[in-house]
Amino acid sequence: MNNNDLFQASRRRFLAQLGGLTVAGMLGPSLLTPRRATAAQAATDAVISKEGILTGSHWGAIRATVKDGRFVAAKPFELDKYPSKMIAGLPDHVHNAARIRYPMVRVDWLRKRHLSDTSQRGDNRFVRVSWDEALDMFYEELERVQKTHGPSALLTASGWQSTGMFHNASGMLAKAIALHGNSVGTGGDYSTGAAQVILPRVVGSMEVYEQQTSWPLVLQNSKTIVLWGSDLLKNQQANWWCPDHDVYEYYAQLKAKVAAGEIEVISIDPVVTSTHEYLGREHVKHIAVNPQTDVPLQLALAHTLYSENLYDKNFLANYCVGFEQFLPYLLGEKDGQPKDAAWAEKLTGIDAETIRGLARQMAANRTQIIAGWCVQRMQHGEQWAWMIVVLAAMLGQIGLPGGGFGFGWHYNGAGTPGRKGVILSGFSGSTSIPPVHDNSDYKGYSSTIPIARFIDAILEPGKVINWNGKSVKLPPLKMCIFAGTNPFHRHQQINRIIEGLRKLETVIAIDNQWTSTCRFADIVLPATTQFERNDLDQYGNHSNRGIIAMKQVVPPQFEARNDFDIFRELCRRFNREEAFTEGLDEMGWLKRIWQEGVQQGKGRGVHLPAFDDFWNNKEYVEFDHPQMFVRHQAFREDPDLEPLGTPSGLIEIYSKTIADMNYDDCQGHPMWFEKIERSHGGPGSQKYPLHLQSVHPDFRLHSQLCESETLRQQYTVAGKEPVFINPQDASARGIRNGDVVRVFNARGQVLAGAVVSDRYAPGVARIHEGAWYDPDKGGEPGALCKYGNPNVLTIDIGTSQLAQATSAHTTLVEIEKYNGTVEQVTAFNGPVEMVAQCEYVPASQVKS
């Protein structure tokens, strides 16, 4: 399985293990208004407006208005009662100065190909070429790398791309490259890299992308809800498939119950989150734990539960293994230090009695633990995820409605009951056709590496690392192809990325915006946005509310092409066009995908209309038949018949499998490990005292829509990405609201606009991830980022030898008022087009 298949699989794990429901059989209620049903098990013909062109996106379904050939306005789909504010920026996604208009090639690469001066990468100087020239160069580089170096030298990567079941860049990239030859695959992802590796060892499944207990059952049964590093309100604005935002209706119900005193919400977070603010500061108990000390807090809670006899012995005996091996560490018999509340107080900044009181409250009533993803994106992030499960096991409420734990509540409308319906297929990255270069000789190097270590592979080829029980020899990468992704937003330590990219012979980027990845590429190919093509998408993710037509809003802009057409033309150059297209064009694929859905529906008793009727008349169909769901209920009711996917079939508080790996940074049971750098008195805090969060943004999806001036006008400060800072920290540095500040550490420096807010604990600052990198010195390492990309500052180390995932939130910085000349932001301007500087040179004329 290559990296693109792994990404698709991980993002869609939420379709599996839904308490006996299959992919095609998820059930759920209408959330906002009662829906009428036609036949007992038929898709409903929803009564919808026809004003505007209907289409979908990561931010929701919209009605698009077109005037004089331009996409000028986006109105929420009439069934979306809680639309995201981000849809206001969608027209800018199509029409903006950073739009990639033509195929372009970096100046020196055009002259010298793989022998070019790679220190010029990032200087933003490009030459416009024809599509035929660009695709010829693409093909010739694939040929050269396969013949000269073999499959161990080529890596492809995709990411969040655009919505649509057919037009997915990851699948198309994977299939096209697989038809040409083998390459290096990647495993894991940047969102949940630590949790998705540790949790299968502990509870037998990834957990992070799965459906959660239905919100109606939580609202009915929970007395205490613990939000542990989870900001539901902010993060549910954008989903993998087109969101319906129905989950916000349950947040409104939760708000009412909290105000009425029926449910108590506890937020464990150094920040007053958007969800916390929405529910009301006066109603939410705030545990402002010092950053990166969540595990000491968890251990102290476990110690209190044990020492005060508040834990569920029967649950531990019947559903878990390994508590006896964990206990000596918890009690201090192993290292002489009991992990009690007094010990944790010194690390966490939380009063010992508050910790003990929290443990008592969690044990007193039905408690639902809602865990986010940000805490596991730290060094040793596996330990926090493991301890969430241990705490829930000690409480003994796993598998009960409104109890237990969950790691995916903030994603894909989790907790919204699913509906019985069809899950459409899409364009798969797999193929049974053998490649042109059927070479599987990786010369002793590993064919799959952890995605968060791909820069390591470039900088340290041949290095052997551990990864989830395996030994990995990093391959000597020479060429990378990026489609539908932006490593400058998702990978850490940008100056290290730049050093790595300089060692590559060729970088190819396929995108619709001039992101930093494109600026540092050699060949840049312009792809369409989802608003320039036709597609199909699920409406609602976990809810599976319906299927929506994604109608083309405007024609492809400038010389942009669909990814499908780009890779079709590439495959034609090595006689695999038919194998890639399977004889179908865009509408042919949509009809095939729809017909597969029709057949799937027949097996489920769900009727879909004929494609032409749907596409030309209905545009949207809605599914019915709600069914409530309780996470882990089947396991609780019969652990023998419904075992977990662990070696024991039970929850593994102690894992012999992990213990046998002999890793010093991830052992047989959860533990506290000091970090390489940590604020509030931790290592490195004397020089860089502020912890930097780089969490999901509020006005974009990762780096998507950062190009939107409409949205930037709503959140930027002095034209910069905002940095949020506590009033005490700001005052001590002479910083006021609106000041341009320099945020820096030994890894780099950025400018940002100060927002002074008491929502952030002293010693904590935040810059949202996804801000576009804007160096003041082109592609030089160490340049000052004029806009404010936090990955200039983050650290590129693995969480541990187990997951080798990102440790973005193990980052310390200092902030000072900037007194230098504030240069104009140029990240959103596109490239410098060089004219008549050089000519296209065929590969045969390039001298080694």
Curated annotation (Swiss-Prot):
Cofactor: Mo-bis(molybdopterin guanine dinucleotide)
Gene: torA
Subcellular location: Periplasm
PROSITE patterns: MOLYBDOPTERIN_PROK_2, MOLYBDOPTERIN_PROK_3, TAT
Binding, Mo-bis(molybdopterin guanine dinucleotide): S191
GO BP terms, alphabetized: aerobic respiration; anaerobic electron transport chain; anaerobic respiration; regulation of pH
InterPro entries noted in UniProt: Asp_de-COase-like_dom_sf, BisC, CT_DMSOR/BSOR/TMAOR, Molybdopterin_N, MoPterin_dinucl-bd_dom, Mopterin_OxRdtase, Mopterin_OxRdtase_prok_CS, Prok_Mopterin_Oxidored
Keyword Cell membrane: no
Enzyme superclass (EC): oxidoreductase
GO cellular component, one term: trimethylamine-N-oxide reductase (cytochrome c) complex
Family: Belongs to the prokaryotic molybdopterin-containing oxidoreductase family.
Keywords: Metal-binding, Molybdenum, Oxidoreductase, Periplasm, Signal
Protein name listed in UniProt: Trimethylamine-N-oxide reductase 1
Reaction equation(s) it catalyzes: trimethylamine + 2 Fe(III)-[cytochrome c] + H2O = trimethylamine N-oxide + 2 Fe(II)-[cytochrome c] + 3 H(+)
